[in-house]
């Protein structure tokens, strides 16, 4: 691959809250990759881009992470991700999987809440689980397999617009995660606060942001009020294709 020898500099700004599991660091790398592609006039197949970004984070920055955040940032919108080894492919030294775009109009009303002051870096959240998984701990291995099953069921619930089922799966996701992680009390409090309003709740990623389904504007207002009382900010994310 031949690149021209013109110089460049990179400057960036972001409004993504830091260290609350909303993938702010990888979003900067994805944006930088897009700039470099345009600057050098090169193309990287879309399915390979998340793996390229992840390799920069793991190999150059030493960050423990997975492909999920990078996939949705590269594809945008809503994407079903299948990480089964049966669909694993390798091209140009990059391992990637099966990613399916879904229509964002299938989504029910969702909220996103994050803590305004407390946070935890993604690598802190993931490092212990990675070593336990690699060591073959059955509790962790079984939980990871269950997460995959929940994803398949979540896709089916979206396609059939079964929002009650989707809400139940969201709650089951968090309950499964709680069974293998030692979570800070303030993160548990965020989830339990949303659930007391009648909404579903799970982590949006790692480190202090949650996402879930709400049923009415009155419920959303209650979520906002109760989240504010524990130092958290709530928004309605806009998901476009």
What is each model feature region?
Residues 1-52, 56, 191:
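Anion-binding (especially nucleotide phosphate/pyrophosphate-binding) glycine-rich loop
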Residues 2-4, 13, 42, 51-64, ...:
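C-terminal nucleotide
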Residues 19-30, 64-79, 206-207:
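FAD-binding core of FAD-dependent oxidoreductases
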